[in-house]
A protein has these predicted regions:
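Classical nucleotidyltransferase
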Residues: 1-77, 134, 154-171, 178, ...
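Phosphate/ribose-recognition catalytic cores of enzymes acting on nucleotide-derived substrates
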Residues: 12, 67-186
Length: 186
């Protein structure tokens, strides 16, 4: 990672008929913007800083799969999104963001990581999102999730009722900040 030089890569390319053109690294503050730096920001849950370095929001794609059913049972269904294992995911926590389904973008309350209240479940999700205002079946559909900001880190609650109140509060705040109706993009 980052151990080569433009000259070495240019020689490698020349042997394979590929022209290599080097460029200067972008600098933010006193450090270069690199993929490693961006991955570290994402891993720390700082999706706002990562977006600044990327020039866009950090997002992932996946397919909606059946989940544990706890969200639906508590009144806020979630889309459990299967993401490739090698994708850098943000720190465990609740995020405000957006979910794109087909040609529509919905505001979303997103949970990244294993929810602490259900950590013993064999089918614990890594990424689940409540698409605010969405009603319909998403199973098997491709969804893109864009992370806008962290709302709070993951934590355990003293009871299921306390968890429900917290999630309802998260969803209500995100709905207020981002809206409850989709935006058509296609």
């Amino acid at each position: 990672r980052g151990a080569s030089t433009v000259d070495v890569i240019r020689a490698w390319g020349a042997n394979r008929g590929v022209e290599v053109t080097g460029h200067e690294l972008l600098i933010d503050g006193d450090a270069p913007i690199t993929a490693t730096r961006i991955r570290r920001l994402i891993a720390a849950g700082d999706v706002v800083a990562a977006a600044g370095e990327l020039g866009r929001r950090f997002y992932v794609h996946g397919v909606v799969a059946p989940g544990r059913g706890e969200g639906t049972g508590m009144g806020f269904p979630t889309a459990n999104i299967e993401v490739q294992a090698d994708i850098q995911m943000p720190a465990d926590g609740v995020y405000a963001g957006f979910a794109r389904v087909g040609g529509e973008v919905w505001s979303a309350a997103i949970n990244a990581g294993v929810p602490p209240m259900f950590a013993d479940s064999a089918a614990s999700a890594r990424l689940e999102a409540n698409l605010i205002g969405y009603h319909g079946d998403l199973y098997g559909r491709e969804v893109s999730i864009a992370f806008d900001r962290m709302v709070r880190p993951s934590r355990s609650f003293e009871s299921i009722d306390a968890l429900i109140r917290a999630v309802e509060g998260d969803i209500a705040q995100i709905a207020t900040d981002y809206g409850t109706t989709p935006v058509r993009i296609a």
